[in-house]
Design a protein with these regions (language model features):
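N-terminal ligand-binding/catalytic initiation module
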Residues: 1-132
Length: 132
């Protein structure tokens, strides 16, 4: 699976039991086949587990972050951003969508701190709080 080496070097599946179980189930069921999903949460090594589960489920995944242009800035680890891009996953900023260089054609957006609240997903938003 995507990112297995990086994840396994840092975490034991017992540390993320729900996402581990979901990835195992979703790899055969593929509930997200054909869905374009934007995940806009802080980008760090631990969020690779979330991406891995969504990819196992067939998601056409994009990872997004705001660099503050829309009033919100969410942190990210540039090393992990590069790793994601090296694995062929689209990384977009809110500014990319605002200026039209990336289409606002997502089916589902998982959004932390409202970074992409101006978008119009076909299926809807999942609001993930910044407070934890």
């Amino acid at each position: 699976m995507f990112f297995s080496e990086v994840i396994n070097d840092a975490y034991d599946p017992r540390e993320y039991p729900a996402l581990s179980l979901l990835a195992d189930c979703w790899i055969s069921r593929r509930p997200f086949d054909g869905l374009k999903i934007l995940v806009a949460t802080p980008i760090f090594r631990n969020t690779l587990v979330q991406y891995q589960a969504l990819l196992a489920g067939g998601a056409d995944l994009s990872v997004g972050y705001s660099n503050g242009s829309g009033g919100t800035s969410v942190p990210c680890d540039r090393k992990i951003v590069r790793l994601i891009q090296e694995n062929g996953i689209s990384v977009v900023t809110d500014e990319n969508v605002r200026n039209g260089s990336v289409a606002d054609d997502f089916d589902l957006i998982l959004d932390c701190a409202g970074q992409f609240s101006f978008c119009h997903p076909k299926k809807g938003f999942v609001e993930l709080t910044r407070s934890g």
